[in-house]
From Swiss-Prot:
Protein family membership: Belongs to the alpha-carbonic anhydrase family.
Enzyme class: lyase
Source taxonomy: Bacteria, Pseudomonadati, Pseudomonadota, Gammaproteobacteria, Enterobacterales
Species this protein is from: Pectobacterium atrosepticum (strain SCRI 1043 / ATCC BAA-672)
Secretion signal, residue range per the UniProt entry: 1-19
Catalyzed chemical reaction(s): hydrogencarbonate + H(+) = CO2 + H2O
Name of protein: Carbonic anhydrase
EC annotation from Swiss-Prot or TrEMBL: 4.2.1.1
Amino acid sequence: MKGKFSIALMLSACFSASASDSVHWGYEGSGDPAHWGKLSPDFSLCETGKNQSPVNIQQALNAQHDPLQLAFQSGTQQIINNGHTVQVNVSSGNTLLLDNETFALQQFHFHAPSENEIDGKQFPLEGHFVYKNADGALTVIALMFQEGAANPQLATAWQQIPAHVDQAEDVRTPIAIQALLPTSLNYYRFSGSLTTPPCSEGIRWLVLDHPVTASAEQINQFSSVMHHANNRPIQPLNGRIIIH
């Protein structure tokens, strides 16, 4: 089964890990976000990029945009704690239709506290669903979690986090991705970047405006696995327009 995930695991290096395995980056000390751009030439956009993520979503322009067109299919999943986040790699069949293009879900992972903010509000947890089209272009759907009732899908995921960093485990009880999302799929849209090195730009960001809940225990459980916050600070908009 693990062979099925070789591509997904390679992709994870682009989304949640370094472009160069020899370069250590993280969220604390000399490898923290303030230093990413100087750690490697590959990471220069982390310092010089003008369309970086995350952002504080304020004064969004009200505009007509297409509703999210998502399709879900049950399949195999694999969960890994890569030292930067807890990530779930998924098999094919989960798609997003956007701008007349089909994007396939590659993986989803989490940040605590949230990276993006809405009207200056930071949430205790944020999920990123990373989609990729046939040309390699990426779209990220961001989901905010606010403290409240326990989340059944997070409970399923957290119970299966591997004990060791970089250990991948087949998910015995698959996480129901659709059930993880809110019933309302209204969203903010802007152009941004990966929030981890190499901070590549040209990423389509769709931030859902309706949060879902997670219990304080679930939020703390994730934080205890990470041992530190894993959020990049807010980046300047530099004139970018956010639509809603």
